[in-house]
Amino acid sequence: AMPARPFAPGIERLAQVHNKHAFIRLADRLGLAVPETTLLQSCADLEAVRGQSRELVFKPAWSRFASHVLLRPSPDFLDAISPSPSAPWVAQRFVAGEEISAYAVARDGKLKALALYRSIHRADKGAGICFEPVEDAATRRLVERIVAGTGWNGQISFDLMREADGKVLPLECNPRAVSGLHFFRDPARFVDAVLGDGPEVAPDVTAPQMVRLAMWIYGLPAALRAGDLGRFRMAMREAQEVLDWPGDPAPVKAQ
């Protein structure tokens, strides 16, 4: 027997939500609106959707940091991928709107911490390197539905899209910590809520957060290509360094 209970679901549940097709099926069974998502396990599966490629997003069923994502590619771009049962892909309907990310911690299906945010700058198409908090009641209800429906224990995160009419659709799930954790800076309150008997803890950081070194490496070149230096300068001026913790200079020095 393990000396301590892992603060996470069983491996089967973790695999289910991390798989980009299985997660959408789970959300659908929980009564949530979801984007049409097709599992691709063969060249025949790929050919069946090739004609609609301009309306779809293609990504490996097992992936993170937006690796290998093809966003509304031309049909010939699909020649670069070869889905199989051991390396499946998904074809998901492209959803226009505002992307929202969610980081949550739950115990026995009840939310104990939740941070909602949007990425202002990214490392290429992947992880956010500058992000700001947002509030959205529909997104909170979606997260509550999933953690309650799964009896979730531990950390769980989501990439979602809010459409123009306010409807929020889940795109994928990451059963781990993500950048939203940086919006909690009071260790005592966080630990009391997550591991003790304290009430749900709200984020105590309201300013945008950034990884300054990554902003110079990824954000500046992207701003130059897009002709958007003004937004880059504003982010560098207003956002706080996520690694800058009072009394602990080591993370910033390591960067």
Regions found by a protein language model. Give the residues of each.
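Conserved metal-phosphate-binding beta-hairpin within the catalytic cores
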Residues: 150-183
